[in-house]
Amino acid sequence: MTVNSIGEYTATPRDVQANFNGMQLLYLYWEEHLMYCSALAFLVAPGMPFAEFLEQVLKPAIHAHPDSAKIDFSQALWQLNDQPFTPDYAASLEANGIDHKSMLRLNTPGLNGIQGSCS
């Protein structure tokens, strides 16, 4: 089968951290809670303490889910970029190793979505 090419394709990424005015993107996926069908994307300051991210960014973002009020973050299991992760709540996102376009996964044992449906 013949393939016709339109030539070399070059692109300049537009989502590099330098284009975010000192901020960075952070993705977060709450496992077994498919009411949120994909990871949530947040624009955050690298110097924001992890505890502040939870209180001021994450909790308001997931507030609509019935399980959100039941989360015990001290029992949460975390992954950062597919690796086990134990956050230092007092340290900044940057000091926790969370950089531009990092993926956090949140697992809340015992909370399995609306009526256990994983949604």
From Swiss-Prot:
Q: What is its EC number?
A: 1.14.13.244
Q: Which keywords appear in this protein's UniProt record, sorted alphabetically?
A: Aromatic hydrocarbons catabolism, Monooxygenase, NAD, Oxidoreductase, Plasmid
Task: Please name the GO terms that the record assigns under molecular function.
Answer: phenol 2-monooxygenase activity
Listed pathway(s): Aromatic compound metabolism; phenol degradation
Return the protein name. Answer: Phenol 2-monooxygenase, oxygenase component DmpO
Q: According to its UniProt record, which reaction does this protein catalyse?
A: phenol + NADH + O2 + H(+) = catechol + NAD(+) + H2O
The UniProt function text for this chain reads: Part of a multicomponent enzyme which catalyzes the degradation of phenol and some of its methylated derivatives. DmpL, DmpN and DmpO form the oxygenase component of the complex. Required for growth on phenol and for in vitro phenol hydroxylase activity.
Gene field: dmpO
- Pfam families in UniProt: Phenol_monoox (PF04663)
